[in-house]
Each structure stands twice: as C-alpha cells, then as structure tokens.
Amino acid sequence: MFKFNDEKGNLKCSFCGKPQEQVRKLVAGPGVYICDECIELCSEIVVEELGVEEEIEFQDIPKPKEILTILDEYVIGQERAKKALAVAVYNHYKRINTNSKIDDVELAKSNIVLIGPTGSGKTLLAQTLARILNVPFAIADATSLTEAGYVGEDVENILLKLIQSADYDIERAEKGIIYIDEIDKVARKSENPSITRDVSGEGVQQALLKILEGTVASVPPQGGRKHPHQEFLQIDTTNILFIVGGAFDGIESIIKRRQGEKIIGFGSDPNIVDVDEGSIMSKLIPEDLLKFGLIPEFIGRLPVLASLEQLNEAALVQILTEPKNALAKQYQKMLELDGVELEFDEGALAEIAKEAIERKTGARGLRSIIESTMLDVMYELPSREDVKKCIITAKTITDKEKPKLLLEDGTELDEGSDTKTSA
C-alpha cells in the first residue's frame, strides 16, 4: 500500500534523488519512493500523451461550412473547388471515426483530383486542409516516381515523407494527407494500353493503385530502394487521404470535343463546339481523364473531381492583400521589423498581377516579382535608420523606378543620395 511521508528516516525520491526534507510529499512503493514533484511531472507527460490520442480520434471534425470558412481566409476564389474539398474531407474523416463500416455498408475513400493551371492554388488548398485538421502532410512530385525496378523513386518513398512529417509516429501518419503534384505528367501517351514498358507513366499509375485504395505498405526507413536485408516500417494507407493535382494541359479540347460531338454546320469542325473557357472545366467528367491518359483503375480510386479556374487580375490583387498570410502583409511585417512602414499603392498591385499573368505563373509567380522589386530596398533599409516609410508605385514595377523612401518628417529621400526633397 502507498503511504505518505509520515515516517521519519533517511528517505529520498528514487527518481530525482531529492531527500524527504526537500519535498512536500513522498509516496512509497515496494522498495521505491516518488516525490510530489515527480508525480506532477509524470501527470503532465500522461496528459500530453492522451492529448495526442484525442487529436488522432477526430472527435470534433469541422463541418463542411466551417472548413470552407477557414479555406476562405487563406485561398481566394475557387469557390466550387473549395466546396468539393470541404465535403470530401469531412466525409473522409467521418468515415475514419466510424471505422468505415456502418450496418454492413462499407464507406469508400474520398480521394480527390484537383485540376487547374499553374499557380491556381492546388497545393495551397491541400496544405490549408492539413493545417485545419492538424494532421501530418506530405507533398510528392509524380514526375520523380518510377515503377519498381527502374531508376527513380519508389512510390513507397511518398509514404516515408508522411511518416517523417509525423515525427515517425505511424498511427498519426496513417490519418494524414498526401498531395501528389504533376499527376498529369504520368498519363500514358494514348488511350490504348501500351505493349511497351512505360516506366514513368502508366507504370507509376499502376504502382500507386494499392496505396490509394488502402494497403499495408513496407517503407524503407531511410528512403531509397528496397533491399532484402533491411528492416521496414509498416504503414496502413486505408485512412490516408490522397489528393492528386495537375494542370492537365489540353484537357479543355477533350471536353469541347465531347460536348460538340453532335454539332454540325457549314465551315465548322463537327468535333468541337464553342464553349466559354471559364465554364468548360465545370463540365469535366471521369471519361475525359481517361481520354487524357489516366488508366480506368486509377480514375476509379479518385472519385472526387474538383477543377480550379485560371486566376484573373482582380483575383491576383486579392491574393496579394486579403488572405491571412497575404504576400503584401508578409513584406510589410518584414520591413516593420526594421522600423519601416511599407505601402503598395493600387497601381503597383495591379501591375504585379499583370506581370504574373504575362509570365503564365499565376499566384505562384507573385512572390518572385515582389522579391526582385524589393531586393535593393531590403538591402539598403536595415542600414538606414532615418527612413520610416517605403512606397511601391506602379512605375516601380513597370519602369523599374526606385521606390519612394520617406523620412520621419515626411520628406522624400532624393534618389541616389542623402538629399531631402518635398514629399
């Protein structure tokens, strides 16, 4: 029986070594003693461990509307895609909580395909979902994968990235999210099955089938190729949510051809109908992915299709300023640490957006444009304690003029010198 320190004697804690006189309570066990401080420490460790278990159980899955509201804080536009993702993610983790089987009805996985041009927000959507749910997240590039036996990465290395993201906690990793980018680059070259080996196309799709559906995979703990004498990590992929994304360049013409099969007329192509480019992707169906070069079994394991639109100038300006982690806010915070207020006028934001559209890089290209614009400023300002404000104008972007630098009294620093001029 445990007892408190009501006995006198030269007793001390078996864990921290403190004598009885230096602690408030000393609990005795068969041949051992533990003090109140060590009990408190052990209690904290247990609570912390139980907290992780509760996190894994997903008892409070956010509802689709709540997921969409949080996505809106980070991702501009793409309303249809965000709604599809919110529903798919909610259903996926609800399925995990019910062990995927209710009254003999087995709930299938809701793996997702994101289709949209470069810089439209595919990767950001996947990252934000993982952040909302507080689950491990990993990104893989499909172009680096090859089927087993060929030079390149095995598909199991994707799972290793997720395990590493979960700090090698396999149970946590088994409820994570994996985003595979550039999936369109592993499409086979034609609709018909190839009689020759396609190691980085159809072969990769075949290799991905099992982990998409759910299997216990053997993963080399250090990555690389498998060899017979190494130990493997075992991970069950049944409850891992897979999101695959790609630009799928040219799929619009496949959709148009299907839409226009019965359209005939003098001087017109009977296979193509004139459809608004903005709405064409909303008519995407799985058969279009089959025509593009994904194999039927692969498409069957990706039941949720979500298409993203090309971002226009207005959307790119919003991306620069509105999200919680907007680029403009990031650079303003960066200069604020040097005691300088940064301002982008409306003309500057519009020109940054136009340049990103011209480069065909979408939102992904915004950072590089701002970075090149701000390089000289970020180099000079840490050494200029007299400068209190920096203004980026449209001409700073288009004509490469230097930004306006204002001193504490509101006067402008003369370009190329320390001379003050009227602001």
Swiss-Prot record:
User: Which residue positions does the secretion signal occupy?
Assistant: none
Stretches the record annotates as Disordered: 404-423
The record's listing under PROSITE patterns reads:
CLPX_ZB
Keywords from UniProt, A to Z, are: ATP-binding, Chaperone, Metal-binding, Nucleotide-binding, Zinc
Q: Which GO terms describe its cellular component?
A: HslUV protease complex
What's an example Gene Ontology biological process for this entry?
A: proteolysis involved in protein catabolic process
Show where the ClpX-type ZB domain sits: 1-54
GO molecular function ontology, one term from the record? ATP binding
Task: Tell me the residue numbers annotated for binding ATP.
Answer: 117-124
At which positions is Zn(2+) bound? Answer: 13, 16, 35, 38
Say yes or no: keyword Chaperone present. Answer: yes
What top-level branch of life does the organism fall under?
Bacteria
| Pfam families with a match to the protein in the record | AAA_2, ClpB_D2-small, zf-C4_ClpX
Q: How does it assemble?
A: Component of the ClpX-ClpP complex. Forms a hexameric ring that, in the presence of ATP, binds to fourteen ClpP subunits assembled into a disk-like structure with a central cavity, resembling the structure of eukaryotic proteasomes.
Family, per entry: Belongs to the ClpX chaperone family.
HAMAP family in alphabetical order: ClpX
**Function of this protein?**
ATP-dependent specificity component of the Clp protease. It directs the protease to specific substrates. Can perform chaperone functions in the absence of ClpP.
What protein does this entry describe?
ATP-dependent Clp protease ATP-binding subunit ClpX
- Gene source species: Lysinibacillus sphaericus (strain C3-41)
Q: What is the lineage of its organism?
A: Bacteria, Bacillati, Bacillota, Bacilli, Bacillales
